[in-house]
Design a protein with these regions (language model features):
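Short, glycine-/aromatic-enriched active-site segment of Class I SAM-dependent methyltransferases
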Residues: 55-77
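A short acidic, Gly/Pro-enriched loop at the edge of an enzyme's catalytic core
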Residues: 7-19
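Short strand-turn motif at the edge of the Rossmann-like AdoMet-binding core
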Residues: 30, 53-56
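Conserved Class I S-adenosyl-L-methionine
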Residues: 99-164
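A short glycine-rich, Lys/Arg-flanked "PGG" loop and its adjoining helix->strand segment in the class I
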Residues: 34-49
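A short SAM/SAH-binding and catalytic strip from SAM-dependent methyltransferases
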Residues: 17-32
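Short alpha-helix
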Residues: 78-94, 100
Length: 164
């Protein structure tokens, strides 16, 4: 496992069989997403796989007020896409095959936190989220938002395959 700046990876072309991107592409505008994916494509060997996990809209997009709330609670100019939007993005960046799975997002749910982080990790996250008044305000705002928008937001996992 290696960590590097995703926009300028310090590796030669065709270096890796697998590149993993965890919940980061959503944080970028569509053009920036394409640039990052092109960089992942560059370092993948022919037949290599890009594995991503991100946020997906279940409809075309959130309402303007809801999108503004999402940006506010995450503190980033987040830009999720639909299932087809994610597929098109990877195909337009040169990948020959895109396998996808999506489902209910458990971000900020007690069950999801325990499953993803383990009991100790979940307790630590909740403790840190509630420790100060500012943390508590932001944590509860995120919790309420993701709970209220659960029908409009899913997780999506993609396995994009570079041609041989």
């Amino acid at each position: 496992v290696m960590a590097a700046n995703a926009s300028t990876l310090p590796f030669a072309d065709n270096s890796f069989d697998v590149v993993i991107n965890e919940a980061m592409l959503t944080m970028y505008a569509d053009k920036a997403k394409a640039k990052l994916i092109a960089e992942y494509y560059r370092v993948l060997k022919p037949g290599g796989r890009l594995l991503t996990h991100d946020i997906m809209f279940t409809a075309q997009k959130l309402g303007a007020g809801d999108q503004g709330q999402l940006v506010d609670v995450v503190k980033s100019n987040v830009s999720p896409m639909t299932r087809q939007g994610w597929r098109d993005l990877f195909l337009n960046c040169g990948f020959e095959q895109v396998l996808q799975q999506n489902g209910n997002m458990s971000l900020m749910s007690p069950r999801g936190l325990i499953r993803d982080e383990g009991l100790t990790g979940a307790v630590k996250i909740v403790f840190n989220g509630l420790r100060t008044s500012e943390n508590r305000r932001r944590f509860l705002k995120m919790f309420r938002f993701f709970r209220s928008q659960h029908h409009q937001l899913n997780y999506i996992a993609c396995c994009s395959v570079k041609g041989k």
